[in-house]
Amino acid sequence: MQDQRNLLVFSGNANKPLAQSICKELGVRMGKALVTRFSDGEVQVEIEESVRRQEVFVIQPTCAPSAENLMELLVLIDALKRASAASVTAVIPYFGYSRQDRRMRSSRVPITAKVAAKMICAMEADRVLTVDLHADQIQGFFDVPIDNVYASPLLLADIWRAYGTDNLIVVSPDVGGVVRARAVAKRLDDADLAIIDKRRPRANVATVMNIIGDVQGKTCVLVDDLVDTAGTLCAAAAALKQRGALKVVAYITHPVLSGPAVDNINNSQLDELVVTDTIPLSAAARTCPKIRQLSVAELLAETIHRIAFGESVSSLYVD
């Protein structure tokens, strides 16, 4: 094992268990920092050990409450830079605000993915590490190097182990996810591919209209980058079962699971939802028998190690 003494890992409050698991994989202790609130609710941060000339990694997904977690990340980066860290890498397992990545037609709306990226760069973070960005082009919003790594090796290994490839078909829940679904299907012995054509009348409401592909008597594996209210997912499962699917499972990286998501999943025809721990599960989600969680700790720890010691990251992760 290479000398790790110049590598320090700090964490905000958004996902402490993941940060601790990453530290365990790296064989380093968690950096000492106070991350709390003043009496008026403002973020209070104090770095409680020397970071001078150290390679520092800050682990903080910007999941709900998104504004608070983003602010924690920004203040942590600022505190570390002012404490003379040699470099600070923002490790953002789930990059919040990423779904607002463009203006639709003539809508008078912000591009909040760009806003969040600019804020992180303004704090002079030296690098960003994230997992499965909602859209690859978000990388262009950052003015610093960014490594967007993929959870697909972890998910693929679990699909092989749990379901194999016999009688299996990979399903994209919408037209926009076809590239991701095709990549997964290719690595599952060129499994068949189906596409769900959905029409969304308004945000977080989806209506499944048509299925392109033959799912009769097959195990359907839905793949996507995130699940929010699970409305689309549950409607897709119902449509697939209606078309004769034997089993419907979903492999999704980021378990946002807001609002009625857990109830929707419990009451759906979905057989299993497999997610990662880029976002911590709520108490309700942890007790849901249909939800199973895999850990990205080993993937992120290996990536952090490679960044810290100047090794290739792209050779490790395959889209």
Swiss-Prot record:
GO terms of biological process kind: 5-phosphoribose 1-diphosphate biosynthetic process; purine nucleotide biosynthetic process; ribonucleoside monophosphate biosynthetic process
Entry note: cofactor: Binds 2 Mg(2+) ions per subunit.
Subcellular location: Cytoplasm
Binding locations of D-ribose 5-phosphate: 200, 224, 228-232
GO molecular function terms attached to this record: ATP binding; kinase activity; magnesium ion binding; ribose phosphate diphosphokinase activity
Residues where Mg(2+) 2 binds: 174
Active-site residues (renumbered): 198
GO CC annotation terms, alphabetical: cytoplasm; ribose phosphate diphosphokinase complex
Protein EC: 2.7.6.1
Annotated binding of ATP, by residue: 40-42, 99-100
Pathway info: Metabolic intermediate biosynthesis; 5-phospho-alpha-D-ribose 1-diphosphate biosynthesis; 5-phospho-alpha-D-ribose 1-diphosphate from D-ribose 5-phosphate (route I): step 1/1
Broad class of enzyme this protein falls into: transferase
Annotated catalysed reactions: D-ribose 5-phosphate + ATP = 5-phospho-alpha-D-ribose 1-diphosphate + AMP + H(+)
Annotated binding of Mg(2+) 1, by residue: 134
Keywords: ATP-binding, Cytoplasm, Kinase, Magnesium, Metal-binding, Nucleotide biosynthesis, Nucleotide-binding, Transferase
Cofactor(s) this protein cannot do without: Mg(2+)
Broad class of the protein's primary localization: cytoplasm
Keyword hit for Cytoplasm: yes
Highest taxon in the source lineage: Bacteria
Assembly with partners or alone: Homohexamer.
Similarity comment: Belongs to the ribose-phosphate pyrophosphokinase family. Class I subfamily.
Biological role stated in the UniProt entry: Involved in the biosynthesis of the central metabolite phospho-alpha-D-ribosyl-1-pyrophosphate (PRPP) via the transfer of pyrophosphoryl group from ATP to 1-hydroxyl of ribose-5-phosphate (Rib-5-P).
Protein name: Ribose-phosphate pyrophosphokinase
Origin species: Xanthomonas campestris pv. campestris (strain ATCC 33913 / DSM 3586 / NCPPB 528 / LMG 568 / P 25)
Taxonomic lineage of the native organism: Bacteria, Pseudomonadati, Pseudomonadota, Gammaproteobacteria, Lysobacterales
